């Protein structure tokens, strides 16, 4: 039986990162997302600079202001977060359909079928993080292991912008020394019960019998007993049916030079064709999307009589669509190429290994 390989990707201080990307003046500043300092709301996300002052998620905004009076308080922009999240999930699904999103900024990926001797799971995780950085200009932390629990644990061990692998060689040492509050799923209430019963780290938890843990925590006790041993049989659950394939890029600076933009369209057409080939699919619609320097999003789609899957065919259609969309006087900051209305190809295509 092939050993499972699971990746857990967790974006670093996601909302704050998006705000700093879209407003470079905030970079390196203590950014607190959630609302005005005087509001009655709570903190959604705080940058690492703000966390140094003790600010954290779910804290009342008024308290955050007391701790960090010179912080940059930003109202949540969920439209931007959802749009960026969709980009990230699209990247995940370009590698595997076995993706289980847990929120806008984290997901599990089962990449068992992609792993081979010269392409370990850690390298695939590196490729994914690189794609996220190139396409969204955001960093992500990744955890790699043989089950979901350990992958999630690993993703939080070297934040921000980290990659951690937990395998059979190091799992025991990691779990035995882990503070009980750092076990995924152990909140404040559970932590207090643990402390009241002499459980302060993974070793203390490991030494409790299953019966003792069930007595303390009910049905959850069995799960805690297994976690102390690094056991988790839960599957990556994905019910999504792929409807489209695409990729997009944000330029380092706003661009209105056709030659530079069309070079990027060619590159994106190639990436999209590669992903179609991996899936052994062809497409009957092509869409080009641009975002102007004023953050206005424009798109144009063409439906086709015959399906396409090659780089050249996709580019030729994308070229026409871009020419319909462009305004020589309006620079753009992002361009994307997406194909949809997918159908099964009638010939054998490349696999992921042909283009990783």
Swiss-Prot record:
Q: Which reaction does it catalyse?
A: DNA(n) + a 2'-deoxyribonucleoside 5'-triphosphate = DNA(n+1) + diphosphate
Residues with site note (Substrate discrimination): 15
Pfam families noted in UniProt? IMS, IMS_C
Record's subcellular location: Cytoplasm
The alphabetized list of GO BP terms reads: DNA-templated DNA replication; error-prone translesion synthesis; SOS response
What quaternary arrangement does the UniProt entry report? Monomer.
Family in the record:
Belongs to the DNA polymerase type-Y family.
Protein name (Swiss-Prot/TrEMBL) = DNA polymerase IV
Q: What is the primary gene name for this protein?
A: dinB
């Amino acid at each position: 039986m092939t050993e499972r390989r699971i990746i857990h990707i967790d974006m670093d201080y996601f909302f704050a990162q998006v705000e700093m990307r879209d407003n470079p003046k905030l970079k390196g500043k203590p950014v607190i997302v959630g609302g005005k300092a005087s509001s009655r709301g709570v903190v959604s996300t705080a940058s690492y600079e703000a966390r140094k002052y003790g600010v954290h998620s779910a804290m009342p905004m008024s308290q955050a202001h007391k701790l960090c009076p010179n912080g940059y308080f930003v109202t949540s922009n969920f439209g931007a977060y959802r749009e960026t999240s969709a980009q990230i999930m699209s990247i995940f699904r370009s590698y595997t359909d076995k993706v289980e999103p847990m929120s806008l900024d984290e997901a599990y990926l089962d990449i068992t079928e992609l792993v081979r001797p010269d392409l370990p799971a850690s390298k695939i995780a590196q490729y994914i993080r690189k794609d996220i950085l190139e396409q969204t200009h955001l960093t992500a932390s990744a955890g790699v292991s043989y089950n979901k629990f350990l992958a999630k644990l690993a993703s939080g061990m070297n934040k921000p912008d980290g990659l951690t692998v937990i395998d059979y060689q190091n799992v025991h040492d990691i779990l035995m020394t882990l503070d009980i509050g750092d076990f995924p799923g152990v909140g404040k209430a559970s932590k207090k019960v643990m402390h009241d019963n002499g459980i302060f780290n993974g070793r203390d938890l490991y030494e409790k019998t299953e019966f003792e843990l069930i007595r303390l925590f009910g049905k959850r006790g069995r799960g805690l007993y297994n976690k102390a041993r690094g056991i988790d049989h839960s599957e990556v659950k994905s019910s999504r049916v792929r409807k489209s394939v695409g990729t997009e890029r944000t330029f380092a600076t706003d661009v209105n030079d056709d030659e530079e933009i069309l070079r990027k369209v060619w590159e994106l057409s190639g990436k999209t064709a590669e992903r179609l080939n991996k899936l052994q699919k062809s497409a009957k619609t092509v869409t080009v999307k641009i975002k102007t320097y004023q953050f206005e999003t424009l798109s144009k789609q063409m439906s086709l009589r015959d399906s396409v899957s090659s780089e050249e065919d996709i580019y030729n259609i994308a070229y026409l669509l871009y020419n319909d969309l462009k305004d020589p006087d309006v620079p753009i900051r992002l361009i994307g190429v997406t194909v949809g209305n997918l159908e099964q190809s009638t010939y054998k295509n490349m696999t992921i290994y042909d283009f990783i």
